[in-house]
């Protein structure tokens, strides 16, 4: 995990989950989005941007262990676990940017591990008489998803419904999806990348400063 030390006017949590690390399309496009957001909130009169703090999690470079019995036991005993840090990073963020490739119709296992650690009763959601309630409200989430084929709005896209359900369970309901599709199809890759970049530019333009 790396942190760029800047003032906390806006805190952006950037999570990359591509197995290819920084070389993955979802990583490159999500970085493009973070850079544009950073520039949007930059102080044009300052030599150094003091208006944005970026906290980055590269799950390929620094894998998070999958949730196991030992971790669950430690949580129950009130002992410190890695999820404490991950949850605090999420709570501190004003904006969350997720780079999420589609692997075998689902999310990367590293991202699923991150999800399992941040979903904790009493911290990111709570149980009530009427059902669970998410505790992470008033945060903007951007999901940049890359796919080899075309799945958007099709029955084969089980990834986005899962992401919407999981994020919404935590109270993260203000979610924008950016799609880069057709990346493994002959003659379609460049258009897929261009469409995603255009969507990023449009969304950043709409983001309130």
UniProtKB/Swiss-Prot annotation:
Top-level taxonomic group: Bacteria
Cofactor(s) in the UniProt record: FMN
Gene3D superfamilies: 3.40.50.360
UniProt catalytic activity: 2 a quinone + NADH + H(+) = 2 a 1,4-benzosemiquinone + NAD(+); N,N-dimethyl-1,4-phenylenediamine + anthranilate + 2 NAD(+) = 2-(4-dimethylaminophenyl)diazenylbenzoate + 2 NADH + 2 H(+)
Binding site for FMN: 18, 102-105, 146-149
Known EC number: 1.6.5.-, 1.7.1.17
Pfam family name, one: Flavodoxin_2
Class of the enzyme per the UniProt entry, highest EC level: oxidoreductase
Cofactor binding description: Binds 1 FMN per subunit.
Keyword terms of this UniProt record: Flavoprotein, FMN, NAD, Oxidoreductase
One annotated GO molecular function: oxidoreductase activity, acting on NAD(P)H as acceptor
UniProt subunit comment: Homodimer.
Annotated function: Quinone reductase that provides resistance to thiol-specific stress caused by electrophilic quinones. Also exhibits azoreductase activity. Catalyzes the reductive cleavage of the azo bond in aromatic azo compounds to the corresponding amines.
HAMAP family given in the database record: Azoreductase_type1
Family: Belongs to the azoreductase type 1 family.
Name of this chain's protein: FMN-dependent NADH:quinone oxidoreductase
Record organism: Saccharophagus degradans (strain 2-40 / ATCC 43961 / DSM 17024)
């Amino acid at each position: 995990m790396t942190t760029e030390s800047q003032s906390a006017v806006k805190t952006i949590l950037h999570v990359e989950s591509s197995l290819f690390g920084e070389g993955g399309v979802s990583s490159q496009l999500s970085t493009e989005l973070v850079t544009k957001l950073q520039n949007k909130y930059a102080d044009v009169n300052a030599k150094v941007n003091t208006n944005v703090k970026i906290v980055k999690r590269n799950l390929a470079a620094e894998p998070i262990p999958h949730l196991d019995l030992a971790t669950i036991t430690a949580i129950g005993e009130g002992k410190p676990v890695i999820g404490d840090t991950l949850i605090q990073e999420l709570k501190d963020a004003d904006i969350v940017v997720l780079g999420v490739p589609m692997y075998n119709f689902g999310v990367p296992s590293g991202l699923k591990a991150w999800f399992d650690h941040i979903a904790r009763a009493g911290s990111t959601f709570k149980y009530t008489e009427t059902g669970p309630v998410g505790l992470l409200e008033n945060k903007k989430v951007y999901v940049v998803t890359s796919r080899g084929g075309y799945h958007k709005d099709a029955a084969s896209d089980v990834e986005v419904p899962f992401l919407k359900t999981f994020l919404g369970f935590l109270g993260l309901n203000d979610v924008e999806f950016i799609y880069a599709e057709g990346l493994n199809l002959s003659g379609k890759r460049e258009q897929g990348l261009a469409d995603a970049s255009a969507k990023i530019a449009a969304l950043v333009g709409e983001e309130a400063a």
